[in-house]
Amino acid sequence: MAKVINNRNRKPRKKVCILSAKGIEHVDYKDVELLQRFINNNNKIASRRVTGASARMQRRIANAIKRARFVGLLPYVKE
């Protein structure tokens, strides 16, 4: 009989933050390409579990996205 691997006890691999891997400390609200990586299909800000960002970086990302939306660089809702 084949051995069944139990995935319930397996610890999920920790995601690596894209910004920390590239050495980016400051998230600029004008960098729309970078900010779009942290937005899902419905233009909502993706959670830390999805992005793998630290708490500090997630706050910086969220503030930059909100600023970009206010200025008009990113849409609030999906068209």
Swiss-Prot record:
GO terms for biological process: translation. One of its GO terms (molecular function) is structural constituent of ribosome. It comes from Ureaplasma urealyticum serovar 10 (strain ATCC 33699 / Western). It holds the Pfam family Ribosomal_S18. PANTHER family: 30S RIBOSOMAL PROTEIN S18, SMALL RIBOSOMAL SUBUNIT PROTEIN BS18M. Keywords: Ribonucleoprotein, Ribosomal protein, RNA-binding, rRNA-binding. Belongs to the bacterial ribosomal protein bS18 family. Part of the 30S ribosomal subunit. Forms a tight heterodimer with protein bS6. One of its GO terms (cellular component) is cytosolic small ribosomal subunit. Binds as a heterodimer with protein bS6 to the central domain of the 16S rRNA, where it helps stabilize the platform of the 30S subunit. HAMAP family: Ribosomal_bS18. This is Small ribosomal subunit protein bS18. SUPFAM superfamilies: Ribosomal protein S18.
